[in-house]
Structures are given as C-alpha cells and as structure tokens.
Amino acid sequence: MADEDQYRGDDQIDEEEEETDESGYKTVKDAVLFAIEVSDSMLTPRPSSDSKKPAEESPTTAALKCAYYLMQQRIISNPRDMIGVLLYGTQASKFYDEDENSRGDLSYPHCYLFTDLDVPSAQEVKNLRALAQDGDESKDVLKASGERVSMANVLFCANQIFTSKAPNFLSRRLFIVTDNDDPHGDNKSLRSASTVRAKDLYDLGVTIELFPISRPGHEFDTARFYDDIIYKASPSDPDAPAYLQTDSKASPATGDGISLLNTLLSNINSRSVPRRAQFSNIPLELGPNLKISVSGYLLFKRQAPARNSFIWLGGEQPQIVKGVTTQIADDTARTIEKWEIKKAYKFGGDQVAFTPEEMKSLRNFGDPVIRIIGFKPLSALPFWANIKHPSFIYPSEEDFVGSTRVFSALHQTLLRDKKAALVWFIARKNASPVLGAMVAGEEKLDESGVQKFPPGMWIIPLPFADDVRQNPETTLHVAPEPLIDQMRYIVQQLQLPKASYDPFKYPNPSLQWHYRILQALALDEDLPEKPEDKTLPRYRQIDKRTGDYVLSWADELEKQYAKISAHGPKSTLVKRSAKDRTSEVEDAAQKPYKKVKVETDEQGVEDVVRAHYQKGSLSKLTVPVLKDFLNAHGRSAAGKKADLVERVEEYLEQK
C-alpha cells in the first residue's frame, strides 16, 4: 500500500511524530500455495454434506471454489499476500515457460501451475472463477492423467515456487487437497524421496497443511503416508512470529477436507490484521546493571477503511494524485522556502523561536527502554486504566544472551504472586514516554489445542491525571430483589457458549461492507444489495430461550409497581376554579415585581471576565456569562462549565 505520509505536508508530519509510527512495523505477509489433486475420484461429483446445498459437486471443483473465495478476499483485505494454485495429476503439464509443446523433457510432468504464486490480479481471480464454475477451460485443464504422480515431484515443484516467488516471506504455507491417503503404495523409494522433499520444505520455513477428503466407504488414514511428511509444529521464525492461530483446525483422519477448507474461509473472512513488530531488541531494565533484550508486537489494533491515495476524476481516465504542499506568505502571497520557516511557542505574550535541533532535543527523553520502577498487586490496576492498545513483548537473545531465561523467571513470578510491574516505557526514538503496567499473560489454547494467545508480557499504557474524566453525578436506583432474581434467569439463558466472547466470529459490518464494495468494483461483479451483519441479535433464538422468562419478569414488574404505588405519597393538589385564578392574576398585576438584572453589554462582559482571569477566579462566573464571552469571540460554547472555563483561559492566554 502507498504510504499515507506522501499526501501530507512536512509540517503535519513533524507535528505527528509523537503519534505511533507504523511505517517501520514488520507486517507478516502470507504466501499460500494450493496443491489440488486432479484424479478420477476427485473429479467424481459427490452429494454435498450441507442440506441447504443439495447439488452434487466434485471435490476438485469445491477446492477450486475455496481457493477462489480465499483469493477474492485476500485481494482486498491483505493486498500484499500471495496466493497460487498448483494442480497435480493432470494430463496436461505447465510450469512457468514449460508446457507439453516445449522441446525437451518437462521438469515436473503432470503438474499444472494454473495461477502463479503472486499478488493476485483481477484477471487471475476471474480465470480461477471460470475454472471453478466449469468453464470451457476446465474441460482442457481438469483431465486426470493415467500415470501415477510422484509426490516428491509435487513437493519439489512447490519448493521451487516458494524459493523463486516468496523467498523472504515470514509465513509460507502449502495446502494439499487430496482423497488419496497412500499415493505410492509399497514403493519405498518414492516414499523416501517424498519424505526428503517435505523436510526440505520444512527447513525452508514452509508449513504443509493437509486437507483430507474421505471417499465413499473409505475413511482417509493419514498414518499410511502423510504422517511422515507433515510436521505438527510450525517452523519457528526469530524475526517475527507466525499468526496467532492457524487458519484451519488440525485435520483429523476422518475429517472432510472441503468442510475444513470452508472453516478456513470462515476464519479468514474476519479479515484479521497480521501481527506487527512494534520495536525490536530494546533493553528491559530490571535493576541497576541488569538488562535483557525484548521485542514488542502489536497484536490488537482497530482496523478501519483507509484512503491509500487521492484519485482525480476530472480527465478521461482516473489518475492517482501526488500531493504537494506549498507554503505561501499571507500578506504577499510569496512562496516560502523551508529554511525560512521557524517554529515558536508563546510564553508570556512573546513568541520564542526554536531551531530544529532544539525542537528535537525538547522531544528527546532518552533512548528506547523499558525500565521497571516497582511492583504493585494486580488488584491495584483498575479496569478503566486500559485506554490504549497494549504492546506484547517477548524475549530476544540478540543483544543479551540469557534474556529468555530471565524473562521466563520474571513472567512466572508475576503470575504466581499476581503482581504487575510499573514501568517507564519509551518505544522508539523521539517517542513520548509513558508509564505502563507490565502484566504477565498466560498461554491460551482453543478447544482443538491451537494457540490463541502466546505466553508473554503485556505493557498497558496507564492514563495520566489529565486523561481521567470525572463521571457525571447520577442517582442509583436499585430494583427490588424479586425483580433482580427474575432477571437473573434471563441473563443466564443469554450467555454465549462457554461464557466467552470470540471477536473473530463477529467481523466489523461496516468494514466488511466497504471491502465487499471494493471487491465488486475490482472484479466487475454486481454490487451487493445489503451488507451481512453478524452482530445483529438473533431475535428468534432469544425469544425461544427467554420468552417465558421475560413474561414472568414482566408480571413481577407489575406486582412490584403496584406495591410501590400503593405505599407512595398521596397527592395534596386541589383543583381550583376559574374565579380563583382570575383573582390571583389581578392581585399580581397590582403588586410590583422584581426584575432579574441581565448583563447585555458585551464590553461589560469582557471587563468582568478579564478581571476574574487576573484574579484566577474564572470558576466563580456563571455559565451564561462564560457562554456570552465565548460567543462574542467566535469560540464554541458547548459543554460543561469546566470546559467553558478552559476555553476562556486558552483564549486569554493567547492575547
């Protein structure tokens, strides 16, 4: 993606240096290569396991559709990811510049590279869609070969594709979709060669994931061949971690590969943002002359539609606009050079100018560091103190050998004693320091044993006093105990499964709609009619679970209201006649009445406010006077009295 800084002026960039700069983050780019077997059994249509879609479909076609949907999603959500489709077992052969019409022997016979491993273009997505929908091209490509295909050849072909197209990617995965659990039978040489090629892929950093498809009357048995070529653990990467969770669950021997692929797509559809390396190898000071090295990652970040570039639509074709900022003098309209611009602050009514070097020194609070100041019990950390996204830190052995051992000891101690460390935290050069709470986090696994959150430390930035606002004064009304007891049954019925909220199951509906529109425009598809919103309550399910309890609660509410009304104070109002009201009006007209003095003179308001400002007693002024002063000077008069006083002080300090 284009860098957003190129569309902003230099002065704007300087003013925002204190904000989190994400341009230096290491994004985890993903490269996925589908290896789909084309055989007679894979091309045979089978009844769908989904009762809503009873149409028969071959496993090869279903796998191609899954690859198409994945490519369709990634082209918008993760535009830097690479996806490729390799068909093996085909009658035709194609690999880069080679095909069956080429001279000489083929490097990889019966391997057809339909989509090269690259960032998918709109045309490649359309071609894959045509193949998955039984187009004219599928009749020529999807023809099974009568010869046996060597899995060693397929794995070596995948090795060359990853090496040439994605040599530096942090996440590389090979998805094998097949229904043949023993491709080589008793041929020990081919089995041994396949094991060697799989080990080469593992050493390269490629994760092989199998999506087995059971045949009718025959369950897929991974122990016959694939247990020897698939490693359970992902290859470790010292530079950056892999994804928090794998996109597909572990494939059981009796699992259906297509259903697993559909699970993969449903997980990816949440468009989770890759983890970002926030900083690398900064010292964690535990005490005087005791330092270890840690790296930090941004695991959670709010994702929103971002403008990558401005588009000019005034010509025949839309063009990307390159932003240029020019400073012009207000009085002479002369172009001002960068060296003529100086930054200044007002002190006591005078402007004090600073050189660029002095400005940098003002912002320099020291080198990046995480310094432990002390320890506090976890109970002293309130829930509302988490106001910004936390940083996840993990030990690094690059600068200080033994960092992992010390980090682990500190992590276990904080967990055991239920304490948090108070730290002085500077993430990068020229970054503003923050006081943070370093909290130890345990490893969390899902029901299938896949890691959801790794073990490590979390640094939570704590708010300063200016960041904490006072809650508005409210009167607490407590419901009667019988009413609370009835509501308890309703809440118990509405709890989520296992009483836990999984954010990956509820994607942002507005963001999904934004991506869907972009996807339709890029692929020349029909615009969708309405967005899919998984956050909407399931009203029928709610009514089924809690309908009777809600009616019982409503009956109890009527009973409690009747009790309160019966014991409430009786009204002492007496209806008066029209004659009484007329006499009161006449008496009021004869009596003199006091008028409230209202200050309407703007100069008078100005003098009063300035006098109180000199005495430091602006808070003693009434809200109408403060609002009149702000309105007279074109300032906003909305908000509470404290906000009005603050705006008045800001205005008078500038004068």
From Swiss-Prot:
Keywords linked to the UniProt accession: ATP-binding, Chromosome, DNA damage, DNA recombination, DNA repair, DNA-binding, Helicase, Hydrolase, Nucleotide-binding, Nucleus, Telomere
A UniProt-annotated Pfam family: SAP
GO cellular component term of the entry, any: chromosome, telomeric region
Source species, domain of life: Eukaryota
E.C. code: 3.6.4.12
Keyword Hydrolase: yes
Subcellular location as annotated: Nucleus; Chromosome, Telomere
Ku domain residues: 284-493
TM regions (residue ranges): none
Similarity comment: family membership: Belongs to the ku70 family.
PANTHER family: KU AUTOANTIGEN DNA HELICASE, X-RAY REPAIR CROSS-COMPLEMENTING PROTEIN 6
Summary of the function given for this chain in its UniProt record: Single-stranded DNA-dependent ATP-dependent helicase. Involved in non-homologous end joining (NHEJ) DNA double strand break repair. DNA-binding is sequence-independent but has a high affinity to nicks in double-stranded DNA and to the ends of duplex DNA. Binds to naturally occurring chromosomal ends, and therefore provides chromosomal end protection. Required also for telomere recombination to repair telomeric ends in the absence of telomerase. ku70, of the ku70/ku80 heterodimer, binds to the stem loop of tlc1, the RNA component of telomerase. Involved in telomere maintenance.
Self-association and partners: Heterodimer of Ku70 and Ku80.
Name the record gives this protein: ATP-dependent DNA helicase II subunit 1
